């Protein structure tokens, strides 16, 4: 088995050059701006490095966001860890999770799996482990199961389905409904149901210096917990990814940023939902942060390009003959005016289709029809751990 490493190349199709090799080292600007606005990736070549059988994962309890940030800084400054992320369950409870690949499990360390329907969801398991301890707890997880540890439950978005239907949320119901609770099924149901227009799905990157203030804001405004924490290493190359201009003491190295995953129900009224998202974008901007562009984006075009180097981006589109393709802004923006008009023109039947529980039931129907649960059942990562026994 192998893990993906950095480097390699991909091949993209653009209007000026049928096949354009894009080496990470030689053409880094292409990799950092593409978003299918420069061309369409048709072939990917990856550099690999040897993987190990297990990840020894350690859960470090924290009691505040400031403590979480300090631990993230410490753990990302060392080179003997392979993985670092974190979960804040509330303002006073969280865990920073570190991982180290190994073929040999340390003495006294037990193994844990997350692939079977009877297994716990990862985030619930971590919360359970740190509930009664003040010191780090370590266990070994088969590598493939660690890499897909958030698949069952879709991080914690799956709990929202239980909340929506007012259905009991416990070990028995999670086991019974396991087919519906993998990321692909949840994603399909969310969008088919129309609930994505009422659900906040945002990854937001900020300087460490303003991350705690931002979390205080999201708590007061949305009340969404848990939050996912993921440290981000910056690159000096211009990019369409989140970035900031804060430097380390040497004046050359860009400081890391912190990605905060904010996923949960927002205001149910459409106008209030848009307003809440716009306010979120303004607060993010105020604190020197940026959002990842996979998510709903409500910026005006002028606001959007204030965050990025438009001239540099357009020059690249000219260079690669990609001006006939939609720009990044055109791909990610939400047409607020069109959505508002559509809301106002809904028929009685259309309104009923978006109401509880009909929209949710329709989402489930479409998710079942997609048969993505069959792919989840056959996923190789779910059997990897059993091969190690």
Can you annotate each of these PLM segments?
Residues 1-389:
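Noncatalytic alpha-helical scaffold of FAD-dependent oxidoreductases
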């Amino acid at each position: 088995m192998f893990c993906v490493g950095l480097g390699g190349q991909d091949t993209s199709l653009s209007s000026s050059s049928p096949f354009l090799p894009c080496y990470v080292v030689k053409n880094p600007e292409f990799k950092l701006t593409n978003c299918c606005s420069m061309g369409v990736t048709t072939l990917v070549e990856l550099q690999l490095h040897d993987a190990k059988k297990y990840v020894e994962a350690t859960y470090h309890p924290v009691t505040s966001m400031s403590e979480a940030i300090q631990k993230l800084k410490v753990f990302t400054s060392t080179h003997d860890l392979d993985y670092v992320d974190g979960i804040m369950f509330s303002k006073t409870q969280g865990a920073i999770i570190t991982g180290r690949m190994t073929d040999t499990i340390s003495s006294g360390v037990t193994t844990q799996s997350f692939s079977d329907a009877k297994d716990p969801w990862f985030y619930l398991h971590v919360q359970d482990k740190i509930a009664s301890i003040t010191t780090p707890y370590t266990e070994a997880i088969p590598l493939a199961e660690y890499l897909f540890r958030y698949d069952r439950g879709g991080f914690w978005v799956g709990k929202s389905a239980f909340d929506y239907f007012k259905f009991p949320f416990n070990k028995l119901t999670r086991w019974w409904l396991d087919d519906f609770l993998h990321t692909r099924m949840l994603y399909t149901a969310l969008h088919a149901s129309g609930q994505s227009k009422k659900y906040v799905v945002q990854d937001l990157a900020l300087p460490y210096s303003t991350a705690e203030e931002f979390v205080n804001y999201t708590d007061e405004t949305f009340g969404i917990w848990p939050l996912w924490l993921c440290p981000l290493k910056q690159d000096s190359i211009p990019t369409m990814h989140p970035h900031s201009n804060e430097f380390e003491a040497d004046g050359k190295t860009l400081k890391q940023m912190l990605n905060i995953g904010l996923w949960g129900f927002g205001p149910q009224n459409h106008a209030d939902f848009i307003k809440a998202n716009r306010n979120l974008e303004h607060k993010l901007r105020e604190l020197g942060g940026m959002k990842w562009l996979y998510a709903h984006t409500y910026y005006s075009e002028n606001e959007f390009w204030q965050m990025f180097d438009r001239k540099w981006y357009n020059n690249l589109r000219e260079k690669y003959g990609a001006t006939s393709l939609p720009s990044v802004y055109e791909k990610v923006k939400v047409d607020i005016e069109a959505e508002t008009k559509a809301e106002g023109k809904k028929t009685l039947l259309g309104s009923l289709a978006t109401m509880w529980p009909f929209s949710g039931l329709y989402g489930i129907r479409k998710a079942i029809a997609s048969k993505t649960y069959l792919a989840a059942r056959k996923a190789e990562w779910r059997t990897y751990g059993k091969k190690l026994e």
